[in-house]
């Protein structure tokens, strides 16, 4: 009898959750009991951004679905998007996250992407100086050195019109740059860095089992994380290798600092992100911040990091800084190859503003048309759109819709970026000139997010892309060939990356 009562209680609990949106009168895809539509969000061959677009066409600009035990609302109305990301940030300061990612407030290894409230503010404040114009200027020499290494390889590979998978080359470049800037790698290791294989595996391996089961059975998260990290189940291999590499690098630097201190040697100017974070290191395991009274205007003076937070920060910068910039470069290149007139116009700008072999920060700042080209590429392919998802932290109302605390809100960025009512009838055209118009709806452009949680590394990523593209376009013209996928096929979950990008590089005369 007791077993039957427990079983009935469990079934009732899951059914009550499954019908959450139905009881609130909001349309949306049903999914299956316990897991909801989690499977659709974990599909690798059909990026979730496409899935949300499909559902939005069917259910409208605001609808709901369940993803495991999490209740998810989807928004693509520009006014409501601004309400969530900017105007009501105090009510949506948390990010959507799966239980296996840990508790943003209590877990010791939460990084800036997953943190929220006062903890996020502390991490953001400490990290922000690394992405100021002054700091970025200092790493331009490193970027230039990695660029020259890539150019050598491109010269070898592009002879006689050979098809080159540009996405793989961009991955080599961006990983080389971020390894040197963030982790202190002294010299270029392009095309010979063994860690890159595991970093790629971190993104490419589909760990749907742990995401699915942790979402459907959040009470089992500790056990699932143990299986993942300690036993190596659910494709944990690449994650474990990368995590160990970052941990070893940080702990080695700490040991070196302690040895130097014994000999009276003080730390000099921070040479990389590890140094910068260690300058803020505190001898505590956890600060225990409470977000009960958090508001975006709240003052908070803690400027310290725990050792585990330093490791987590370095980890997220390494993997995120590598993946996103390589994907963006790939899509820009794809659109240039498809639009020869636009590519020619961009080459003219580069030739004019960057006449010498060495390219400076000030010269890159003058490449306004290149800014437009990158923006337009990211408008059409907002590949990291899930970074715009938020968690409702306090009961509130947006428009006429009640949103309860604990509900996740996903911004359907793909629909918003392809909305004729927002961008006009030429919305599907690759048209960089649209960004010259003062009427361009800047507030509807979310490739780097909006509001207080706008992408911290935006300026770094743009400089990295502009520097490399300038060097390539001074020497070559991108062209399609028989191996080019037309249209390009996108795959992936957290980010929508190209399956491949085979192009020819025609030397300029």
Curated annotation (Swiss-Prot):
Its cofactor is heme. Transmembrane segments: none annotated. Heme binds at residue 455. Gene3D superfamilies: Cytochrome P450. It is an enzyme of class 1 (oxidoreductase). Keywords: Heme, Iron, Metal-binding, Monooxygenase, Oxidoreductase. One of its GO terms (molecular function) is oxidoreductase activity, acting on paired donors, with incorporation or reduction of molecular oxygen. Its EC number is 1.14.-.-. InterPro entries: Cyt_P450, Cyt_P450_CS, Cyt_P450_E_grp-I, Cyt_P450_sf, Insect_CytP450_Detox. Cytochromes P450 are a group of heme-thiolate monooxygenases. They oxidize a variety of structurally unrelated compounds, including steroids, fatty acids, and xenobiotics. Belongs to the cytochrome P450 family. PANTHER family: CYTOCHROME P450, CYTOCHROME P450 FAMILY-RELATED. This is Putative cytochrome P450 CYP13A8. It comes from Caenorhabditis elegans.
């Amino acid at each position: 009898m007791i077993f039957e009562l427990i079983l009935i209680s469990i079934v009732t609990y899951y059914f009550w959750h499954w019908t959450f949106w139905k009881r609130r009168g909001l349309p949306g895809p049903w999914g299956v009991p316990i897991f909801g539509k989690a499977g659709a969000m974990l599909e690798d061959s059909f990026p979730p951004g496409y899935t949300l677009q499909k559902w939005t066409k069917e259910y409208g600009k605001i609808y709901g679905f369940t993803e495991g035990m999490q209740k998810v609302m989807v928004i693509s109305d520009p006014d409501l998007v601004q309400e969530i990301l900017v105007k009501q940030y105090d009510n949506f300061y948390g990010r959507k996250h799966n239980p296996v990612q840990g508790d943003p407030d209590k877990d010791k290894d939460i990084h800036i992407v997953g943190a929220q409230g006062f903890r996020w503010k502390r991490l953001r404040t400490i990290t922000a100086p690394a992405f100021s114009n002054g700091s970025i200027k200092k790493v331009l020499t490193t970027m230039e050195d990695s660029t020259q290494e890539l150019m050598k390889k491109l010269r070898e590979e592009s002879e006689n019109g050979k098809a080159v998978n540009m996405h793989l080359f961009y991955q080599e470049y961006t990983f080389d740059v971020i390894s040197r800037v963030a982790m202190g790698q002294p010299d270029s290791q392009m095309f010979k860095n063994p860690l890159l294989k595991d970093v790629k595996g971190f993104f490419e391996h589909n760990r749907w089992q742990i995401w699915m089961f942790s979402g459907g059975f959040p009470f089992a998260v500790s056990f699932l994380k143990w299986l993942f990290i300690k036993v190596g189940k659910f494709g944990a291999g690449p994650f474990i290798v990368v995590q160990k590499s970052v941990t070893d690098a940080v702990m080695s630097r700490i040991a070196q600092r302690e040895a130097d201190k014994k000999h009276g040697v003080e730390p000099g100017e921070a040479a990389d992100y590890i140094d910068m974070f260690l300058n803020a290191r505190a001898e505590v395991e956890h600060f225990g911040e409470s977000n009960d009274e958090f508001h975006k205007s709240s003052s908070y003076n803690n400027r310290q990091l725990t050792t585990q937070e330093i490791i987590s920060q370095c980890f997220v910068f390494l993997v995120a800084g590598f993946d996103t910039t390589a994907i963006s470069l790939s899509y820009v290149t794809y659109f240039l190859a498809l639009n020869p007139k636009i590519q020619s116009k961009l080459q003219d700008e580069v030739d004019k503003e960057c006449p010498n072999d060495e390219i400076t920060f000030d010269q890159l700042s003058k490449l306004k048309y290149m800014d437009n080209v990158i923006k337009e590429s990211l408008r059409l392919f907002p590949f990291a759109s899930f970074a715009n998802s938020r968690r409702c932290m306090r009961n509130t109302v947006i428009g006429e819709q009640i949103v309860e605390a604990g509900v996740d809100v996903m911004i359907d960025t793909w629909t918003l970026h392809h909305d004729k009512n927002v961008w006009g009838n030429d919305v599907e055209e690759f048209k960089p000139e649209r960004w010259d118009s003062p009427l361009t709806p800047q507030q509807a452009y979310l490739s780097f997010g909006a509001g207080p949680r706008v992408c911290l590394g935006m300026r770094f990523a743009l400089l990295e892309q502009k520097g490399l593209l300038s060097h390539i376009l001074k020497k070559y013209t991108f062209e399609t060939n028989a191996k080019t996928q037309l249209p390009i096929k996108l795959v992936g979950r957290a980010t929508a990356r190209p399956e491949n990008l085979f192009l020819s590089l025609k030397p300029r005369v």
